[in-house]
Amino acid sequence: MGSFLKSFRKDVGSAAPSVGAPPAKKEPQPLPMTPLEKMLTELGPIRGDGSDKFYGMENFGNTCYCNSILQCLYYSVPFREAVLNYPKRTPIEDLEAALAKALRYQDPNARLEAEALAEKQKAANSPRPGQPPNPQQKPEDKDSPEYKKKLALQTLPLLETTDNSVSYGIPESLFSSLKDMFESIVGSQSRIGIIRPQHFLEVLRRENEMFRTAMHQDAHEFLNLLLNEVVVDVEKAAAKLLESPQPASDVSDSVIPSSSSGSRTPNTTRWVHELFEGLLTSETQCLTCEKASQRDEVFLDLSVDLEQHSSVTSCLRKFSAEEMLCERNKFHCDNCGGLQEAEKRMKIKRLPRILALHLKRFKYTEDLQRLQKLFHRVVYPYHLRLFNTTDDAEDPDRLYELYAVVVHIGGGPYHGHYVSIIKTQDRGWLLFDDEMVEPVDKNYVRNFFGDKPGLACAYVLFYQETTMEAVMKEQEQENTEPPVEVNASTLKQNGFSSSATLAHAHSASQVPTYEDHDRFTGLKRAPTAPQLSTHPEHTTTDSESLPSPAPDPAPLTSLPPIPPIPETPPAPLTSRKSDLQSKKERVKEEKERKAAEKEKEKQRRKEIETRLKDRQRREDDDLKAALEASKVSKEDEDRRNHAENGTSKKNAGGLGRFRSLSQRLSTKESRTSLSRIPPLPNGNHTLSKVPDESEQTHPKSPTPPAPLSRPASQPLNDDLLGSPRADTLAVPTEQEHIKNSKHDRSSHGKWRSFSLRKKSFNILSS
């Protein structure tokens, strides 16, 4: 037993390390592969066009608005090629040699040292036994975007950019710094890394005071400013290049078309206009003279108003809806020469190759006196056709595909964060969040329609032109790919579940359940998508991605009809082409039908105007006939009065019969006063009996009394009737008659004028 213990102690002593020996150096453990690295493992050699480079961009303090827009512009193939080719393309060998020192690889031991230092600080700050734990100290989540960004800065290659405007032959500007960034990414020897756009931001802040502060900026404003600045810088560079003549070899190599990308790069200074510029036509039609006037204006992006529970199609329809110009907003018509009511509408006359749609999420409210974010649900399709075009538009049936989405995360316009989801050339959809770049599935793009406050919302949509053949080819590839298994780790990679700053943007791509399938079935009727076999927004609801239930044994007998499947692919292609042709025919028929309806409406209006003019002419003729009849009746009455009373035409008129009545009364009174005159030589004829005063004062009827009867061959003695004696005798009797009959309705002036008006109206109506 003693010998055994001695030998045991001896073995233990020999196995113990010597006290003075140094500890063994810790070997650096290999980092686990990121999802992006796993995706790029099977790629071949590096391409020379930069389409297989996936670089994040370092955030220098609220510069996410800049990073998201720059990423969208870089992955636009025609825009990237145009920037690289103007004024001339730098050879790839020169780029690689110049960027050999600019690309800085990280030391893997530095990360271990940083982690060891962090662990030591954590151990020093840890509470001692018996002390309560610090509630503010939380364990770091390795799945959060912040941790992934920090890890990327410590491990991925860093790419510095410098000013190379002298080699381009143009002055330093925002365009030259943008070209520096694009050339740095294209010429780098690493597919992944982080680029530092520090020089670009310095030029931006030097030339634009609005971006000098570290405040939250608007991504759409930056896009608009960048495109306009690029246009100005390119025109200045072209003017400088014209002043300094170049050799013929340099001029011939100024634009090198890229055969790998297949994009047609413009070789003029208007390549920005040819890519992003469209033409809007404002049609205004005067409602008075029906003359239409047009005014054209260019645009680099379209800003559309939003409505709750709508789509991009409905927003564009509202954008081109008819607007009534009335009241204070009347239209000045040159044809009418004044302000008139009019109808105004906006239509697209020329479509751009790259369509940037700005969803107006920020609206000024009068109550709050500030901008407020709208969390309206707006559905956007993967493929889009614009319908609000003019009849003479160039290529009105152009098909667009969604290739980039800029997302705003936050509750208001004055704070938040911007990220971009971009469809790459052959690697699918990627999420660019400053330094972090991760692959996402196609359905992840649908998470930013925006229907709840606090969630991420799509802010700028980038559509690029495509063809129906390319869409069909892409769908065939998607149908042949095996279904991807979605597990918890995939959800962590695609979402923002544990981020402190992006926690409100939790929009991980999940496998939809059958309830989700029922909820999204209404989107199948979106009119903006092309007539394809499967709507792009519902690919996850197919049997490929949904877990299908276990089939019954009975349906297994239906398996033999499967062999004819390889013969079916050509059939849908023919039917789709025929559908496209039939759709074009339907569009043409619709245009012809609308033109026919418009012509019919115009003809109907002319007929209505003709009928109105005829009726007005008939009314004028009737009025003239009534006036002529009134004149004839007036002349007849004048002749009758003249024949009965012997009055002259001077007294004839509207009041002639009343004047003759007073004259007859005065004549009667004068004749009664001459009753003592001896009889005339012809004794056979005597004057008729003169009515008494009572009969004159109270007549039995309102009709005037009959004239005195006398022979027509025996005229009155005018000298005797006109003598002063006769006037003296007749005046008191006439005054007495007026005094006695002033209360009589038939003799009052008011009633006489009323009977006159009534008589005139009867004549006109007859």
From Swiss-Prot:
CDD domains: Peptidase_C19G
Compositional bias of kind Basic and acidic residues: 576-643, 734-747
Catalytic activity: Thiol-dependent hydrolysis of ester, thioester, amide, peptide and isopeptide bonds formed by the C-terminal Gly of ubiquitin (a 76-residue protein attached to proteins as an intracellular targeting signal)
Compositionally biased region (Low complexity): 13-23, 249-263
Gene it is expressed from: creB
Biased composition (Pro residues): 548-572
One BP annotation, GO: carbon catabolite repression of transcription
Subunit details: Interacts with creA, creC and qutD.
Membership in a protein family: Belongs to the peptidase C19 family.
Name of the protein this chain belongs to: Ubiquitin carboxyl-terminal hydrolase creB
EC number per UniProt: 3.4.19.12
Domain (USP): residue spans on this chain: 55-466
Active-site residues, as the UniProt record annotates them: 64, 417
UniProt entry keywords in alphabetical sequence: Coiled coil, Hydrolase, Protease, Thiol protease, Ubl conjugation pathway
Coiled coil: 573-620
